[in-house]
């Protein structure tokens, strides 16, 4: 018997397209997502600013974003990597975000793909 989470995951599981991510990056829109992490922990709603779209070492399409609020195991606010195939629901909020240094000193202007060990190929960035 499927539990409610599995049913919702099956109904809502439309992986986000790279076009949707590009649109959010180009327009600097905050997004609301539900994310299915590896261990099915923290699958609730998250508020994220998407900054970079690219491929991981394993060849998965992913985006690097700054998560301000929402469900997470590692706490917020924090920079995180989100695989597109694990995004269960994607909703642009139309709230714009400012590109400025974050509390850890990382900023979109200073992003260096060579220092991001998670993304090996960058397709788009703020």
Role assignments for model-derived ranges:
Residues 2-16:
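Proteolytic processing junctions in secreted/extracellular precursors
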Residues 13-126:
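Core beta-strand-centered patch of the WYL/Sm-like small regulatory domain
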């Amino acid at each position: 018997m499927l539990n409610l989470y599995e049913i919702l995951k099956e109904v809502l599981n439309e992986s986000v397209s790279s076009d949707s991510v590009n649109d959010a990056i180009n327009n600097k829109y905050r997004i609301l997502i539900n994310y299915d992490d590896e261990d099915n922990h923290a699958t609730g709603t998250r508020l994220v600013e998407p900054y970079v779209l690219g491929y991981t070492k394993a060849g998965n399409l992913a985006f690097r974003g700054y998560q301000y609020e929402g469900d997470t195991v590692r706490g917020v606010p924090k920079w995180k990597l989100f695989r597109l195939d694990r995004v269960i629901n994607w909703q642009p909020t139309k709230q714009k975000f400012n590109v400025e240094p974050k509390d850890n000193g990382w900023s979109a202007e200073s992003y260096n793909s060579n220092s991001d060990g998670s993304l090996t190929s960058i397709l788009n960035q703020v």
